[in-house]
Amino acid sequence: MLFLKSSRAFSKRLFSSSTVRYRDIQRLTLTGNLTKDVERLQSQKGNEYMRYTVASNNGKDVAPTFHSVYVFDSYNFDRLQTILRKGTRVYVEADAVWRSVPAGNEGSQAKMSLRHVSADVLFYPRNKNGDESGEETHPELDADPMINSF
């Protein structure tokens, strides 16, 4: 009985009963394939930024989830434009940014955007035709793509 009582007290100390707020959830980790080459865009105010989309899923029979990630650090633009190509399997870390967006008669809704922190290439796309497509291929990585386990 003593053990049961102490384990309950211990579990109560580990569990927080405070409410979760949007600002409490910040960093997301994604693995998946890029749906197209990274895009270099310009805002209405003339600021340059980039956008890429990662498709991820939890198995072959599950529909993919698409995540748009935005890059605002112009220092990385050229490097990212070189390595982030359509079909590349990537590991991405991004910060979740929440903002209010007007929703018509209902008031406003919270919308989440993903701000790029880092991206690592796991696999480059395979060149199935054997022709020179300009994309970098790695024959040693020709194994079937791994299933996303996240």
From Swiss-Prot:
Q: Where is the signal peptide?
A: none
Q: Which GO terms describe its cellular component?
A: mitochondrial nucleoid; mitochondrion
Q: Where is this region: Disordered?
A: 127-150
State the name under which the record lists this protein.
Single-stranded DNA-binding protein rim1, mitochondrial
**Which terms does the UniProt entry file under GO BP?**
DNA replication; mitochondrial genome maintenance; positive regulation of mitochondrial DNA replication
Give the protein's function.
This protein binds preferentially and cooperatively to ss-DNA. Involved in mitochondrial DNA replication.
> What keywords sit in the KW lines?
DNA replication, DNA-binding, Mitochondrion, Transit peptide
- Compositional bias segments (type: Basic and acidic residues): 128-141
Cysteine pairs forming cystine bridges in this chain are none
GO molecular function per UniProt: enzyme activator activity; single-stranded DNA binding
Give start and end of each SSB domain. Answer: 25-125
